[in-house]
Amino acid sequence: MLIVTGMSGAGKSVALHTLEDLGYYCVDNLPLILLDAFVRDFAQHHAQPVAVAIDARNAQDISALSDKLQTMKSVTRIQILFLNAQTNVLARRFSESRRPHPLRNFGSEQIIEAIEKERKLLGSLNNIADMLIDTSNYRAADLRQQLMQLLNTTAPHLLITLQSFGFKHGIPVNADFVFDVRFLPNPYWEARLRAFNGKEQPIIDWLEQFAEPRQFAQETAHYLQHWLSYFTGQNNRAYLNIAIGCTGGQHRSVFIAESVGAILRQDFPDLHIEHRDIEKN
């Protein structure tokens, strides 16, 4: 079990989202009175790793929490992650987000005073933490990378969906990339081929007699192979939708989606291919 705590504004939400992506069962702001029972239940009945976020909203119980966690560590494998940042950085983040600090008394207290009050309140947890991260100079992506390094994990696999479609039926609203293959030779104008689709051999054989379809599929796949790593490495994307469109979504886009997918599966074996409009014509 991982206890995620630290200063408000230091990145607990980013940490929890990262942990969820890594397969953790995450609980935010669990009342401390329920912590013992929660730990016992998960230790006995669940193999999934769990992360519990605790912050200053539990102020009345924080003073006794460090002793409780020390006791629990003797019987359960618990690690404590403490997120910190400089006071001026936290104040700026609250100003930019326009969110109230959980300990701020609006009648008499300034944000700096609330931050220092929280820092003092959480001092005992800071002292017993197994992992300390200062996020003063971090972007969200930096915190995510640092957390994965500390936990000795890698980024989750990018889930890629290749979708063929017909422009006359509309571009998929969830597409991250859109490729237009209406410039390719069109088997629709061959009456004997019209009833087939791009997964069937008559269409495959007809399109492969031209250089352009195979060349476009190969070059598009190589382009994607090069740039997709940036979506996991820098942008931390969990999924990506690639749409390939022709006029009706039955022939050319289906063939290209299957061809590109066959190449990309060498690096992304879980890639999913779907043909949205293959039955609409």
From Swiss-Prot:
Keywords of the record, alphabetical order, are: ATP-binding, GTP-binding, Nucleotide-binding
Q: Does the keyword ATP-binding apply?
A: yes
Q: Which PANTHER family match?
A: RNASE ADAPTER PROTEIN RAPZ (PTHR30448:SF0)
Identify its protein family.
Belongs to the RapZ-like family.
Protein species of origin: Dichelobacter nodosus (strain VCS1703A)
HAMAP family in alphabetical order? RapZ_like
Q: Which GO terms describe its molecular function?
A: ATP binding; GTP binding
Per UniProt, ATP binds at: G6, M7, S8, G9, A10, G11, K12, S13
Function per UniProt? Displays ATPase and GTPase activities.
Ranked from the top, the taxonomy reads:
Bacteria, Pseudomonadati, Pseudomonadota, Gammaproteobacteria, Cardiobacteriales
Q: What is this protein called?
A: Nucleotide-binding protein DNO_0399
Residues annotated for GTP binding in this entry: D55, A56, R57, N58
